[in-house]
Amino acid sequence: VAVSNGSAWITSLTAPTGALVGTTDTQTLTNKRIDPRVSSTASIASPLAWDSDDFDAYAATAQANALTINADSGTPVNAQKIIFRFLDNGTARALTWTTGSSKSFREVGVTLPTTTTVNKTTYVGCIYNAAADRWDAVATVTEA
């Protein structure tokens, strides 16, 4: 494969082996990895106005204030997943989840956490349910 810098051919690279990946046909990929798109910050400003088009996970590594997690402003697809990870800064922080509206959260077999546990990481896993137009919270766990 020839490589150009925009004005001249500068080198060539060995093309990968195997079939090319198409954009519309169904293909099985082997030995490929899709890196999650993660938004990580020390403390998330409240409210969290998040967009499922941009990220697969949100992480707060030293949450310093109470946090409201708004409904998704993106255009999720059925069965899309999102993970939220919270660690406070040594003080328990209130968590409020938007419910009851389009692309908001719904508890399915779990209870959404309403506070962080001091110095412990909490994960919340959700799956988008297109029929219900909700992010179904299906997993919550806090570090022991």
Regions from the PLM with identified roles:
Residues V3, G125-I127:
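Short, well-ordered beta-strand micro-motif
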Residues W9-S12:
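Short loop/beta submotifs within extracellular cysteine-rich repeat domains
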Residues T30-S101, K120, I127-A144:
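Exposed extracellular interaction/assembly regions and N-terminal maturation sites
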Residues G100-V118:
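Terminal beta-strand-rich extracellular "head" domains
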